[in-house]
């Protein structure tokens, strides 16, 4: 499903750049703003959301997908279902980043932070939408979790994308 992103939070961009509350230089502010505007014009955010019942063994029902590690199974232990959310900004975001990498490593780093903040914003919006839908069913969402967080291997990304 295509979604519309109207803003990319500057604070989140600064977080991805390792900012810890110190004053932000005017040149950096300008570069961030330029990349925010460019990204909002060029990206094509899309999401896929699927809800799966959980089998007693912790796998997603009717699949062989079992989240590895201890964190996710513990988080889902009292749950009846799990929601998989996949988000992308589209191929143009990757092309933008590749072009910027050939011009300036510093600017490419800033653009990468802008794009990372953009995909987080897309996921945040979807999470809010899902919270509302689940509340109507008297259900609640756990925290969002992704391969690479906690003890869930990043390699699970490829497996979860199949669903």
Where are these regions (language model features)?
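Active-site helix-to-loop segments that bind/position phosphate- or nucleotide-bearing substrates
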Residues: 1-107, 111
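Flexible, glycine/charged-enriched surface loops at secondary-structure junctions
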Residues: 45-54, 130-146
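Short, surface-exposed, charged/polar-biased interaction segments
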Residues: 53-56, 60, 106, 135, ...
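Short terminal or interdomain "cap/linker" segment that borders an active site or interface and mediates
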Residues: 89, 137-163
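Compact, glycine/acidic-enriched structural inserts
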Residues: 106-128
């Amino acid at each position: 499903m295509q979604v519309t992103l109207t803003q990319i939070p500057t604070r989140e961009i600064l977080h991805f750049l390792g900012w810890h509350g110190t004053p932000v230089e005017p040149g950096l502010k300008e570069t961030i703003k330029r990349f925010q505007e460019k990204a909002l014009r060029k990206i094509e955010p899309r999401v896929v959301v699927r809800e799966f019942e959980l089998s007693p063994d912790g796998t997603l029902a009717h699949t062989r997908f079992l989240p590895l590690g201890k964190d996710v199974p513990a988080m889902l232990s009292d749950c009846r279902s799990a929601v998989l959310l996949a988000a992308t900004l589209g191929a143009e975001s990757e092309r933008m980043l590749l072009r910027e990498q050939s011009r300036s490593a510093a600017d490419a780093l800033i653009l990468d932070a802008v794009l990372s903040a953009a995909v987080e914003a897309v996921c945040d919006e979807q999470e809010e939408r899902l919270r509302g839908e689940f509340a109507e069913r008297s259900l609640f969402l756990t925290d969002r979790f992704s391969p690479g967080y906690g003890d869930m291997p990043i390699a699970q990304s490829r497996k979860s994308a199949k669903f």
